[in-house]
Each structure stands twice: as structure tokens, then as C-alpha cells.
UniProtKB/Swiss-Prot annotation:
Entry's EC annotation: 4.2.3.5
Protein's organism: Baumannia cicadellinicola subsp. Homalodisca coagulata
Protein name as it appears in the record: Chorismate synthase
Catalytic activity reported: 5-O-(1-carboxyvinyl)-3-phosphoshikimate = chorismate + phosphate
Function: This reaction introduces a second double bond into the aromatic ring system.
GO biological process: one example: chorismate biosynthetic process
NCBIfam families reported in the protein's UniProt record: aroC, PRK05382.1
Residues holding NADP(+): R48
Binding sites annotated in the UniProt record for FMN: R125, S126, S127, N238, A239, G278, K293, P294, A295, S296, S297, R319
HAMAP family tied to this protein: Chorismate_synth (MF_00300)
Annotated family: Belongs to the chorismate synthase family.
Length: 355
């Protein structure tokens, strides 16, 4: 199986399955000399961690990360950083009933058609459990980017179902289980998720990620545009079905004189482009949005077939998120950090002499 790595100079490779013994990763390209500890990574892992509230999956994993290599006396050495997170709370028996069934909306059917077999326990490699290592890798990138040039990467829930959340207060994001910046939405979100849980259903979401203090010049022309790489990285997150940069699809109804970001001696007057022009960062905040589909594992019965072609009715068992968008916030932050870190190192390698 290919497709387990992302990045060029800052390269992240992950391995492991949802119900395997552990998940791990190899992070190449981390510059030497940066102070780094497991505690630095644990902060974001705890934000993503399952089982910590009634609004997300009850599967409880501590997600304790172990750094296996690449650190000496608390400082990065420049060699590969090995990461490991053990699985502790697998309930593989929950999936015995679907070992020969394809769950609609999941990767069961497509994985088996491609490989001739599949790990039916929690989706195996296709599970969002894999993203635990991405978040750890993203935490490394976040720390370096903040230390090196003051880049700050943050995300929030912009919408769950019909409830739209405005960016009113960044401080609120970490004060509630929804990563919501709009205190006026919290009661409605609580009622929505509780009702969905009661009736065994799920809902989609929109997540916004913003990177501030990104220097101008990150990104390559044509095929390696910064926004192209961001879209690739964000689309690789489980359940993501759409990515927008800046105003995204809203540009369809905008006029040219509305959409262009005018420039003065004091800087840009707007940021419809989301901080990227011609695939290269402009120095403005880099803004992206992702749309996540509702989880397909719900208690509502539906039709499917067995691997032998027999038509059957299925109700998906197991422990699942009611809204996958909630825990996607730190995952999306991590993917933006990984891309920005890679392009920062690439730009420094090629253009360090440019004044």
C-alpha cells in the first residue's frame, strides 16, 4: 500500500490500523537544535483525544505519544523522529457481525475491490484513528514555525448542521467541547448533538483553519502551489468532501472589483484570496475551510450486500462520533502546519539569498 507519506523536505509517514497494537510515524526533515519533548506533542493530542465528552466517540484512548528517536538531551538532532501511540481500548468484537458485509459510506467496499481483502475491525487503515500521528507531527511543525517566524495556526468549528458559528472570540474555542468561537451557539449545538445521539444519527460540519504571520513567498509555481498542497493535505483527512481557500465558492457570485484584494502602502485592504496569490503566500493570513460529511455509522438500518453479493439490511455497531467535524479541528490544524512547514523549508533552501 502506497500513499502513506506527505511532504518533501518535511516528510511525514504514518503506519498502523484502528484496532492494531499501535500507530506510528516517521518524521523527516526536522531541523536540529529545537527543544522538543513528548509534552509538546501531547497538548494537541489531548485536544483530538476520543472519549473525553458525550459529544464524541466513547472509545477512550489516552493517546500517550512516545518519541523513539531524533531527540538527544531534549533537543532535535536533525535525524528522523520516530513516534508511537499505543491502542488500548479496541472493541474488535463489535465488528464481527460485519466481517462479510460492506458498510455503506465506508471504505469497506473500495478497499476490498482494490486489495482483495480488508481489515473489518473499525475500518483498519482507513479509520480516522490514523490521524493521531498526523496531529503529533503537526505539533512538531507548529512549534518550529512559531519559534522560527511566529506563525500561529488555529482552527474552529464554523458550522454543524444548520447552526453557523461566527468567529467572535478565539479564547472561547478551547473553553468548550465543540471548538466553537461563538458562545451564543453552544446551547443549540448541545441540543442538536444530544438529539442526534438519542436517535442514533449523525451530522456534517464545516471547519475553518487560519494561519497568521505566514511570510510572503511560500509555495511553488504551477503544480506545487501552496493552495494546491493545502487542498491535497486537507482532502486527505477522513470524511472531508470539500476544501475552500479564502472565499472559496463564494467567488462565483462576486464581481472582479469586489474579489480583488487591493493593495496600499499600508498593506492589503481585504483577503478574499485567503492569503495566497498565484499559489504563493502573500503575507496575509492563510485561510482554509473544510466540509466534512456526517459519519456513516449510525443506528438507522440501511441496505447493503455481502462480499458474496447477497442483499441484506445492516445496522452499524461500534463506537462512533456523532459529528466527526468536532475532533477534526486539531487534525486540520496539523495538516496545515505540515504543509506550511514543508514549504517554509523548501523556500529557505531555494530562496535564502533573495533580499
Amino acid at each position: 500500500m502506497g500513499g502513506n507519506s506527505i511532504g518533501n523536505l518535511f516528510r511525514v509517514t504514518t503506519f498502523g490500523e484502528s484496532h492494531g497494537k499501535a500507530l506510528g510515524g516517521i518524521i523527516d526533515g526536522v531541523p536540529p537544535g529545537m527543544k522538543l519533548s513528548e509534552d509538546d506533542l501531547q497538548i494537541d493530542l489531548n485536544r483530538r483525544c476520543p472519549g473525553k465528552s458525550l459529544y464524541i466517540t466513547p472509545r477512550y484512548e489516552h493517546d500517550k505519544v512516545y518519541i523513539l528517536s531524533g531527540i538527544f538531551e531534549g533537543v532535535t538532532t536533525g535525524t528522523s523522529i520516530g513516534l508511537l501511540v499505543q491502542n488500548k481500548d479496541q472493541h474488535s468484537e463489535d465488528y464481527q457481525s460485519i466481517r462479510d458485509l460492506y458498510r455503506p459510506g465506508h471504505a469497506d467496499y473500495s478497499y476490498e475491490k482494490k486489495y482483495g481483502m480488508r481489515d473489518y475491525r473499525g475500518g483498519g487503515r482507513s479509520s480516522a484513528r490514523e490521524t493521531v500521528i498526523r496531529v503529533a507531527a503537526g505539533a512538531i511543525a507548529k512549534k518550529y514555525l512559531a519559534y522560527r517566524c511566529g506563525i500561529k495556526i488555529r482552527g474552529f468549528i464554523a458550522q454543524i448542521g444548520h447552526i453557523k458559528c461566527e468567529l467572535k472570540d478565539w479564547n472561547q474555542v478551547e473553553q468548550n467541547p465543540f471548538f466553537c468561537p461563538d458562545i451564543d451557539c453552544l446551547e443549540a449545538l448541545d441540543i442538536l448533538i444530544r438529539n442526534l445521539k438519542k436517535y442514533g444519527n449523525s451530522i456534517g460540519a464545516k471547519v475553518t483553519i487560519i494561519a497568521e504571520n505566514v511570510p510572503a513567498g511560500l509555495g511553488e509555481p504551477v503544480f506545487d502551489r501552496l493552495d494546491a498542497d493545502l487542498a491535497h493535505a486537507l482532502m486527505s483527512i477522513n470524511a472531508v468532501k470539500g476544501v475552500e481557500i479564502g472565499d472559496g465558492f463564494a467567488v462565483i457570485s462576486q464581481l472582479g472589483n469586489e474579489n480583488r484584494d487591493e493593495i496600499t502602502s499600508q498593506g492589503f485592504l481585504s483577503n478574499h484570496a485567503g492569503g495566497i496569490l498565484g499559489g504563493i503566500s502573500s503575507g496575509q493570513p492563510v485561510i482554509a475551510h473544510i466540509a466534512l460529511k456526517p459519519a456513516s455509522s449510525v443506528k438507522q438500518p440501511c441496505n447493503t450486500v455481502t462480499r458474496y453479493g447477497n442483499e441484506v439490511e445492516i445496522i452499524t455497531e461500534g463506537r462512533h462520533d456523532i459529528c466527526v467535524g468536532i475532533r477534526a479541528v486539531p487534525i486540520a490544524e496539523a495538516m496545515m502546519a505540515i504543509v506550511l512547514m514543508d514549504h517554509f523549508l523548501r523556500n529557505r533552501a531555494q530562496c535564502s539569498d533573495v533580499k
